[in-house]
A protein has these predicted regions:
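Short, Lys/Arg-enriched, Trp-marked, Pro/Gly-tolerant hinge/linker segments that flank
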Residues: 126-189, 199-211
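Terminal helix-turn-helix DNA-binding modules in bacterial transcription factors
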Residues: 199-239, 243, 259-266
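Generic protein-terminus/edge-of-domain signal
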Residues: 1-54
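…primarily DNA-binding HTH/wHTH and HhH modules…
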Residues: 2-3, 15, 244-266
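Short hydrophobic/aromatic patch on the recognition helix
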Residues: 69, 193, 197, 241-242, ...
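Short acidic-glycine-tyrosine-enriched beta hairpin
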Residues: 61-76
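Ligand-binding loop in jelly-roll beta-barrel domains
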Residues: 77-106
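Residues within the helices of the helix-turn-helix
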Residues: 179-180, 228, 244, 255
Length: 266
């Protein structure tokens, strides 16, 4: 392997600090598999992409799911934690804040074939590439990023301190209970909890809980779980009840969704 290839293709446990470089764009490529980045932030903007597997991104007050073949834009200074499962063809690009991208909010976007090729090429750039040689493709990237279709894979967390212990349980893998159970758990009446969720998330608790279950279902399907496993974990009374729920919220079945996000065979 060439020196350039060795520098761009890294192992999950290799030390890497994107903020130590001064080039406009720094890219890396890796086969992450299972990895937990821990909570951190960058001085640069970051774009994450993977061809297969799922990435859950925890923010201070939100949860994001990054499905395969989408990209997430993370503005500089955003504290986040990326939890990866079965991730293949992981690509991460880091952008100087001097580039015309600073107005972009955190978002998940669809990646079309041209955008993918741009991401792929930049991920394997030599870290010593002169800035002048990066200019033309950076221009294409900016055009594609600004034109990319944004998708809603984010769930806001409530910020009321009465729910902090409960939220920590969710982050540890617990499922949100029914409203009457949550009321007993946190010691607040159902009406109060409803007001908190409307105020902090724009959704009532029942809708918020359904959205949480939907994102968890998509995460598990992206990880290769069978429909029956997902239905049982999310406490549906039957596989058919889960399939109906999934179709109602996405317009497709879990089976078709899984087929569309699995790695494409050559």
């Amino acid at each position: 392997m060439s020196d350039i290839g060795q520098k761009m293709k890294i192992a999950p446990d290799d030390a890497f600090d994107a903020d130590s470089f001064d080039k406009p764009v720094i890219g890396i490529a890796s086969e992450m598999g299972v990895h937990d980045s821990g909570r951190h932030s960058h001085l640069r903007h970051q774009l994450l992409y993977s061809a297969a597997g799922s990435i859950t991104i925890e923010l201070e007050q939100a949860l994001c799911l990054l499905p395969p073949r989408r990209a997430v834009w993370i503005p500089a200074g955003t504290v986040h934690r990326a939890i990866m499962r079965g991730v293949m063809a992981y690509r991460s690009l880091y952008f100087s804040t001097t580039l015309p991208l600073s107005d972009l909010p955190l978002q998940i976007v669809d990646v079309n074939p041209l955008f993918f090729e741009v991401i792929e090429r930049m991920s394997f750039w030599s870290w010593e590439m002169p800035a002048a040689q990066q200019t033309s493709l950076i221009t294409v990237f900016c055009e594609e990023m600004c034109a990319a279709h944004s998708e809603n894979w984010t769930l806001q967390y409530p910020s009321d301190p009465r729910l902090n212990v409960w939220l920590e349980g969710l982050r540890m893998g617990e499922l949100p209970p029914r409203l009457n159970q949550l009321s007993r758990q946190v010691g607040a009446c159902e009406r109060t909890i409803g007001r908190i969720f409307i105020r902090d998330t724009g959704m009532n608790y029942q809708d918020w809980r359904q959205q949480f279950r939907l994102l968890k279902a998509m995460e598990m399907l992206a990880d290769g779980c069978h429909i029956s496993q997902v239905a049982q974990y999310l406490e549906f009374v039957s596989d058919s009840a889960f399939i109906a729920f999934f179709h109602q919220h996405t317009g497709t079945t879990p089976g078709r969704y899984s087929g569309n996000i699995m790695p494409q065979k050559d």
